[in-house]
Amino acid sequence: MKSEEKIKLVSIVGPTASGKTELAVRLAERFDGEIVNADSMQVYRGMDIGTAKPSVSLRSRVTHHLIDIVTPDVNFSASDFRRAADGAIADIHSRGKRVFIVGGTGLYIRALLQGLVDSPSGDEQIRGELNELAKEIGNEGLLQLLAEVDPITAERLHHNDRVRIIRALEVYRQTGRPMSQFRQEHGFAEEMYDCLMLGINVERQELYSRVEKRVDEMVESGLAAEVEELFRLGYARDLKAMRSIGYKEICSFLSGEISLDQAVQLIKRDTRRYAKRQMTWFNKEYGIKWVEYPAAFANICNHVIEFFERGEDHAKSTFQHPGSVP
């Protein structure tokens, strides 16, 4: 497909609490657009506070897509996201609106823009066996097993990232080939859309201060009550969605394993670490234009105008790359 035939997107990325949603709403209002969510947790219904979903007032200003589309017991994957996002983008474009993608889930952004690794579909039996094995040898034991057959993928993963460790082992057991080989063959080279990627750069201590404030606000807004309601609806704490940051710690609090203060401190710590991992991911991605927000909003608007009118090359020239979050 020729570049001029591709739908133009503006994708806003960056770490949690960096101000992505606010910037996306302001740009969508300015350019008559709609927003497609690319946050892996905001797709879940009933998980509002802990996922920092856009407020009702923000969503009333601009139409948002792919929020509250599945229940917490659904394992919503990057491929599921890509299919849903492709549909939302086509719908928005067909009505003559601009498309803005916003979210901090790097894999979702990559899947949308460059496609996914052509690896085999999941095998529930193998996955179940690996989950049982994890109970015996722990996450570190699983990672060691992966290192023996796929050291490249093992090097990329943290031992607590059980889902991806099991997925890589699952692929190897199915095919006899390491996941890293599938990734190398794919190359993440296919460009699906014409996209201007804007990354919000926030100074480290300021970002961490925002993280702590956001967590305090979540707790004050009723995060524990939200988790209690999820329990009441029958969603168990071992679900993938319930093991995410904020929910797993409150589950431990409600089960009497830790105090509320301990839960809050753990959420803050884990969110800071998550923000650091997000920045590491996005710093390695090609073509992100890093901006200061809200200070440079007028400049951002000018570059978005140039991108929509003339293409990406002219728009990319004056953006600078940030340093990593230490």
UniProtKB/Swiss-Prot annotation:
Family, according to the entry, reads as follows: Belongs to the IPP transferase family.
Class of enzymatic activity (EC top level): transferase
Give the enzyme's EC designation: 2.5.1.75
Q: Where is this region: Interaction with substrate tRNA?
A: 39-42
Official protein name in the record: tRNA dimethylallyltransferase 2
User: What cofactor(s) does the depicted protein rely on?
Assistant: Mg(2+)
Q: Which gene name does the record give?
A: miaA2
Residues binding ATP, per UniProt: G14, P15, T16, A17, S18, G19, K20, T21
Species of provenance: Geotalea daltonii (strain DSM 22248 / JCM 15807 / FRC-32) (Geobacter daltonii)
| Tagged with keyword Nucleus | no
This chain's function reads: Catalyzes the transfer of a dimethylallyl group onto the adenine at position 37 in tRNAs that read codons beginning with uridine, leading to the formation of N6-(dimethylallyl)adenosine (i(6)A).
MF (Gene Ontology): ATP binding; tRNA dimethylallyltransferase activity
Reactions catalysed, semicolon-separated, are:
adenosine(37) in tRNA + dimethylallyl diphosphate = N(6)-dimethylallyladenosine(37) in tRNA + diphosphate
On assembly, the entry states: Monomer.
| Site positions per UniProt: Interaction with substrate tRNA | T105, R127
Q: Which amino acid positions bind substrate, per UniProt? A: T16, A17, S18, G19, K20, T21
What Gene Ontology biological process does one annotation of this record name? tRNA modification
UniProt keyword annotations, A-Z? ATP-binding, Magnesium, Nucleotide-binding, Transferase, tRNA processing
